[in-house]
Amino acid sequence: MAVRNFRQSDLALVCAIYAASKMDELINETRQYQFLPLVDDQRRYPQLMESDIFVYDDDEVKGYGAVCGSEIRALYVSPEHRAQGVGRRLLEHMLVKSGEGASLYIAKNNHAARRLYQSYGFVITSEFETDYNGVAVAACKMSLQA
């Protein structure tokens, strides 16, 4: 079990994990969302590619995360590998990379993500509305408290 740096050859796997996971973060929303593949998302894909990306590789890529400065920009685990510590390992690796003042953004109703981040000391510092593929979604900024 190892977290390693992303390689360009991982891109198809990262996109597949995103495709299998993205809509899960919106499952508790009341609005209907249309999935947009990662490489077609003109906001999220460039943000991902300008970040430091890490993959959890245990003979297969099971998840990935991305950090840019102190901002954690992505943490996705393939559905069949959830609840096995993959997300925690990726988060711990990214926290070392992001240093003090780490922050991130989540869908407000993504309860699983909120619980994970709160267990590491993140607190909600603001709430706002953003969108996914043109449809409004309530979101939160979470910051790591010292």
Name each model-derived stretch.
Residues 88, 109-126, 135-138:
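Conserved active-site alpha-helix within GNAT-family acetyltransferase domains
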Residues 42-55, 71:
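A short helix-loop-beta-strand connector motif used in the catalytic cores of GNAT acetyltransferases and
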Residues 55, 59-76:
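Conserved beta-strand in the GNAT
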Residues 97-109:
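Conserved GNAT acetyl-CoA-binding A-motif
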Residues 80-81, 85-94:
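Conserved acetyl-CoA pyrophosphate-binding loop and the N-cap/start of the following alpha-helix
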Residues 2-16:
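A short beta-loop-alpha structural element at the N-terminal edge
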Residues 72-82, 106-107:
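A short, internal acetyl-CoA/4′-phosphopantetheine-binding micro-motif in the GNAT/acyltransferase core
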Residues 15-44:
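Conserved GNAT-fold acetyl-CoA-binding loop/helix
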